[in-house]
């Protein structure tokens, strides 16, 4: 339970022996949300002892192979793991995600004993919120890449403050559903008097905001979308010396990623989606150095396969 983030993979283009393709799983009070699903994702999930059966929703950023080729394996395994899913699997992504998935299911004759709900995103037209319940919501944000691509914003809703039982007794508010309504932020009517939640509840706790941003080139609009986020996991594909290549391919350098989060005043930043050319630890450490040179006051770190981050007040602790 709680609010945790598991780094499933951190690479780009192709998996390496010690680095799977970029993928992140967010756990929130028993609900699991997977962001991107490249080749080898199921292997990394298995290594981290994370059940794919517990994945509620898979959010794909774009239809490039290194972000999607692991999807069908997980779709198949959900029907072959010895237990039946009790709820549908939600799959979200840009237009084409449904055709890609269904065509492969049909062509490969994949046995499936559960429902899939597709949420295809038509950028700038589809409602920004693609998932919402009482405690959280997921929004998409447009990215700048060679094909239609979106980032995802995981937003925890503000939590109500402490319920003042003495005040409730004083105002003759009966126990039960009517008190629950106040805790849900609704006004109630007691003895002809309207009572607002603010009269009974203490100060609310601000919810945490997490963004998953890859693949993209630099563009100013992104800064506003992740303004003041608690944690942004953002691509850092190239070293600064390859800025021309990054700009051409619509990717970010380490310095470019740091510049974005600096302007957005992000609290914590995790770098991800490292080029396959960076195979040594020192290569990745150089990416981190370049990011910190651009944003020396920022809390920036390298993500790694198997890393786990746990929510703690207004930030995340690396485990």
Curated annotation (Swiss-Prot):
The lineage of its organism: Bacteria, Pseudomonadati, Spirochaetota, Spirochaetia, Spirochaetales. Its cofactor is Zn(2+). Zinc phosphodiesterase, which displays some tRNA 3'-processing endonuclease activity. Probably involved in tRNA maturation, by removing a 3'-trailer from precursor tRNA. Binds 2 Zn(2+) ions. The active site is at residue 66. It is an enzyme of class 3 (hydrolase). It comes from the Bacteria. Keywords: Endonuclease, Hydrolase, Metal-binding, Nuclease, tRNA processing, Zinc. GO terms for molecular function: 3'-tRNA processing endoribonuclease activity; zinc ion binding. HAMAP family: RNase_Z_BN. Pfam families: Lactamase_B, Lactamase_B_2. Belongs to the RNase Z family. This is Ribonuclease Z. It catalyses: Endonucleolytic cleavage of RNA, removing extra 3' nucleotides from tRNA precursor, generating 3' termini of tRNAs. A 3'-hydroxy group is left at the tRNA terminus and a 5'-phosphoryl group is left at the trailer molecule. Homodimer. Its EC number is 3.1.26.11. The gene is rnz.
